[in-house]
C-alpha cells in the first residue's frame, strides 16, 4: 500500500485509490510512560512465528526513562517548520543536514501548503493527526528541537511489554492498523501500536548470539544489518500479524515513503 501511494503521488493525473474524506483525528494529551530502568528481557519470547532478527531473546540494562504517550502531530511539526527547523544546522546530524541541503527538504513527504497526499488524493492536513512520511534525519532533528530524544528500541519494547505489578502491557492488536474496508490513514488516539512506524535511535544490528535462519527468510534480514535504523510499533498499513513488541522494522535514514513517525523519549 505504501508503494501504491508513492506511485499515485508521482502520477500527474491525480489518480486516487479511494474516493473518501479523511475522518478527524483523535486529540490526545501528551503524557509520559515512565520506566524505572533495570534489567529488561528483549526479543521474541514465545512459540509463535517471528522473523530471525527478533531473537534470540536476551537481557539489556536500561537507565530510568520515559516514553511519550502519543505520537508527534502534524500541528507540532508545523511549529517546528515555523521555528526554522529545516534551516537550523545545529539541530541536525551532519549527514542529515547534508541531505536536507542537497535535496531542498522543507517538509515531510506528501505535504504541500496545508494539504497532504493520501490514498484518496490531496486532502486538508489535520493538525491533530500523527505526522508521517518523515526520515530518521527529520525525526532526530525534531527530537533535538523539542528538547528530548528518540527512544532506543529496547526502551520502546520494555514499555510495550510492561512490567508485572508496576507497568501495564500494551496490546499489539489495539491500535489503528490495516483494515480492508477503509484507506490507511493515521488517526492518533494514544495507542502505542498502530498509526505509523516509530523511529528509534537504535541501529539495525544483530542481537547477541544471532544466527540467520536457513533458506529465504534468512536472506531477508541478516544481510541488511548495515546503515539502517530500527522502527517499532506497526502502522495503519500493517497487517495485524506483523504487530508485536519484538517486531523490528528497518529503513535507511533518508527514506520516507513508509508511514513513519515520531514518539519522543526523555531521561528521568
Per-segment meaning from a language model:
Residues 3, 7-51, 55, 70, ...:
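Functional-site microenvironments in short loops/helix caps that host divalent-cation chemistry
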Residues 218-222, 249-256:
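Short proline/glycine-enriched turn/loop segments at secondary-structure junctions
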Residues 256-268:
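Short, structured beta-strand segments at or near domain termini in extracellular proteins/domains
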Residues 57-63:
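Acyl/amide activation-and-transfer machinery of modular secondary-metabolite enzymes
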Amino acid at each position: 500500500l505504501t508503494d501504491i501511494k508513492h506511485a499515485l503521488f508521482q502520477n500527474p493525473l491525480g489518480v486516487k485509490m479511494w474516493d473518501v474524506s479523511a475522518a478527524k483525528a483523535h486529540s490526545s494529551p501528551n503524557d509520559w510512560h515512565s520506566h524505572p530502568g533495570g534489567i529488561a528481557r528483549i526479543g521474541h519470547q514465545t512459540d509463535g512465528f517471528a522473523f530471525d532478527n527478533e531473537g534470540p531473546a536476551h537481557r539489556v540494562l536500561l537507565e530510568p526513562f520515559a516514553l511519550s504517550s502519543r505520537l508527534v502531530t502534524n500541528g507540532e511539526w508545523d511549529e517546528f517548520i515555523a521555528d526554522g527547523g529545516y534551516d537550523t544546522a545545529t539541530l541536525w546530524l551532519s549527514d542529515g543536514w547534508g541531505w536536507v541541503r542537497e535535496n531542498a527538504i522543507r517538509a515531510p513527504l506528501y505535504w504541500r501548503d496545508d494539504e497532504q497526499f493520501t490514498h484518496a488524493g490531496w486532502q486538508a492536513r489535520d493538525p491533530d493527526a500523527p505526522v508521517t512520511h518523515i526520515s530518521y534525519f527529520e525525526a532526530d532533528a525534531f527530537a533535538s528541537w523539542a528538547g528530548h530524544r528518540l527512544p532506543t528500541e529496547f526502551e520502546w519494547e520494555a514499555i510495550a511489554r510492561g512490567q508485572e505489578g508496576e507497568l501495564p502491557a500494551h496490546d499489539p492488536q489495539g491500535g489503528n492498523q490495516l483494515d480492508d474496508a477503509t484507506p490507511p490513514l493515521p488517526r492518533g488516539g494514544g495507542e502505542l501500536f498502530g498509526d505509523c512506524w516509530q523511529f528509534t535511535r537504535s541501529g539495525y544490528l544483530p542481537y547477541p548470539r544471532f544466527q540467520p535462519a536457513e533458506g529465504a527468510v534468512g536472506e531477508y534480514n541478516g544481510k541488511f544489518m548495515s546503515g539502517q535504523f530500527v522502527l517499532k510499533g506497526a502502522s495503519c498499513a500493517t497487517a495485524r500479524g506483523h504487530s508485536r513488541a519484538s517486531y523490528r522494522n528497518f529503513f535507511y535514514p533518508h527514506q520516507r515513503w513508509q508511514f513513519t513517525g515520531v514518539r519522543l523519549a526523555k531521561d528521568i
